[in-house]
Design a protein with these regions (language model features):
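Protein/peptide-recognition domains central to ubiquitin and immune signaling
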Residues: 1-5, 79, 87, 91-109, ...
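Extracellular/periplasmic catalytic domains that process cell-envelope and extracellular macromolecules
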Residues: 18-22, 40-44, 83-85, 113-114, ...
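Noncatalytic luminal/extracellular "stalk/propeptide" segments of secretory-pathway proteins
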Residues: 1-60
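Second-shell loop/turn segments in exported
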Residues: 13, 17, 24-29, 38, ...
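Catalytic-core environment of secreted peptidases
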Residues: 40-42, 46-70, 151-172
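Solvent-exposed loop/turn segments at secondary-structure junctions
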Residues: 33-34, 54-57, 95-99, 126-127, ...
Length: 172
């Protein structure tokens, strides 16, 4: 088979994969309805890719925030929902409208009593490629993720007010 590198980044709060990584077949779904329709028999032991496309028409109509909200639900709740059906990891198509090979990440959630599985954001371009390949044949991926949560520490924000020479009384 062909080997293709995929651009992804761990979701905020994700657990790591085992040190040696994990390999699994990818199941591509658009939304929670498609995931649940596959049930445990279609999901158990697999890596789920939520390939929900950002709604550009909604964004162009002035509802970009709502379009983003529809996309990020899979980032936040995807791992816990897929884990309930036995998934071993979850990938989420980048939530924004950018069409590039940069993975857009954010926070994910876990639920009490549900097995924690690794979660990562995958770039728009790679999500499209995986979905296209999965229509023709099984796609397997090896994930090696090393995120960690460190103890809280005190931190600071630096804020400065610099007076300009042309309009010193205005804030830019």
């Amino acid at each position: 088979g062909t080997v293709q590198k995929v651009v992804l980044t761990a979701l905020g709060g994700s657990i790591a994969t085992p040190a040696e990584g994990m390999t699994g077949e990818i199941v591509v779904v658009k939304d929670f309805d498609e995931l649940n329709a596959l049930g445990r028999n279609g999901i158990e032991g697999k890596i789920v890719l939520f390939n929900h496309r950002f709604d550009r028409e909604m964004q162009a109509s002035g509802f970009g925030g709502a379009a983003y909200g529809l996309a990020v639900q899979y980032r936040f709740a995807g791992a816990m929902t897929a884990a309930r059906l036995g998934a071993i990891a979850v990938l989420v198509r980048s939530a924004g409208g950018s069409q590039n090979r940069l993975a857009h990440t954010g926070v994910m959630g876990y639920a009490d009593g549900v097995t924690k599985i690794p979660g990562a954001a995958v770039s728009y371009e790679d999500a499209e490629t995986i979905a296209w390949l999965a229509k023709a044949d099984k796609v397997r991926i090896k994930l090696t993720m090393t995120p960690q949560t460190l103890p809280d520490v005190e931190s600071y924000n630096v804020i400065a007010d610099l007076k300009g020479s042309d309009k010193p009384d205005e804030i830019v």
